[in-house]
């Protein structure tokens, strides 16, 4: 019984952490995943991954198909996780967002690394930002 109580306690702590990151999910706790919006499903996927208390989280195309407000909420959560010391492996085409949350960046082209360095170095490299990051 003690283990079950501890497990429930840990589960509740983890759930509360996820709901603090994504308060919008708190309103939908009784909903089936299929009845959630695309943004809520993305938040749920991240929250579900966080329930295992990982040190690393991998996210692919977070902003794809989401409304700007939902993208903002998701990236605010990523910033909090980063500030807590979590390693985030993010595959994203939205360069502005990558530069917002990344410490280090690796630019790939056709599966090959064409540039690797800090986000600050990426911002300060006009050839890189124009050629690969789509920024002028």
For each of these PLM feature ranges, what is it?
Residues 49-50:
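ABC ATPase C-loop
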Residues 71-84:
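Helical segment within the ABC ATPase nucleotide-binding domain
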Residues 1-13, 21-26, 117, 135-136:
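ABC-type ATPase nucleotide-binding domains, specifically the catalytic core motifs of the NBD
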Residues 32-36, 40:
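Conserved ABC ATPase signature
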Residues 104, 116:
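Short, glycine/charged-rich "phosphate-handling" switch motifs in NTP-dependent
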Residues 53:
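Conserved catalytic motifs of ABC-family nucleotide-binding domains
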Residues 98-100:
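A short, surface-exposed alpha-helical micro-motif characterized by mixed small hydrophobic
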């Amino acid at each position: 019984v003690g283990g079950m109580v501890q497990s429930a306690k840990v589960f509740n702590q983890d759930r509360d952490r996820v709901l603090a990151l994504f308060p919008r999910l708190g309103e939908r706790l009784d909903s089936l995943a299929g009845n959630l919006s695309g943004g809520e499903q993305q938040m749920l996927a991240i929250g579900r991954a966080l329930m295992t208390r990982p040190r690393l989280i991998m996210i692919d195309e977070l902003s794809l198909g989401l409304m700007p407000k939902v993208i903002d909420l998701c990236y605010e959560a990523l910033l909090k996780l980063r500030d807590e010391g979590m390693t985030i492996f993010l595959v994203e085409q939205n360069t502005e967002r990558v530069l917002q949350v990344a410490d280090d960046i690796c630019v790939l082209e056709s599966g090959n690394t064409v540039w690797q360095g800090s986000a600050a170095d990426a911002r300060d490299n006009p050839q890189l930002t124009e050629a690969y990051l789509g920024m002028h």
